[in-house]
Design a protein with these regions (language model features):
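Extended acidic low-complexity intrinsically disordered regions
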Residues: 1-14
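Short, surface-exposed, charged amphipathic helix/loop patches that serve as local interaction elements
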Residues: 14-15, 22-118
Length: 118
């Protein structure tokens, strides 16, 4: 297989997933596709175009949390506002690791949106 074919074959690789125990219940998180990540990064901005850290946490969980068939469990990130921070935080940390977001990338997203100073 040539390099071009080998590269494009990677697109058919299944997205990785992991299971996380929260309050005695096991939940499945799936890594983001590039399309999901791009869509989510646009949705992270508030009405004025500023990066919203709280929205980022909830969106990452929304896009990653799936049922046994691989379908998203949460329809709208705002549904997560009622959850305890410890639960969203536990899921969020696992999502960061799974989709390879790190604090530097999150700060860069904030800078690009104009919120953070640099």
């Amino acid at each position: 297989m040539n390099k071009r074919d080998a590269f494009f074959a990677l697109a058919s690789r299944p997205l990785r997933s992991t299971q996380v125990m929260v309050e005695g219940e096991v939940f499945t998180l799936r890594e983001l596709s590039e399309a999901d990540a791009s869509e989510m990064e646009v949705a992270m901005q508030d009405k004025s175009g500023k990066f919203d850290y709280a929205r980022h946490r909830m969106l990452l969980v929304t896009y990653s949390l799936v049922d046994d068939e691989g379908k998203r469990i949460v329809d709208n990130w705002e549904q997560l506002k009622a959850f305890p921070r410890t639960i969203i935080g536990r899921l969020y940390e696992a999502c960061l690791d799974l989709s390879k977001y790190d604090e530097k990338e999150i700060r860069d997203l904030a800078k690009k949106s104009g919120e953070a100073e640099g």
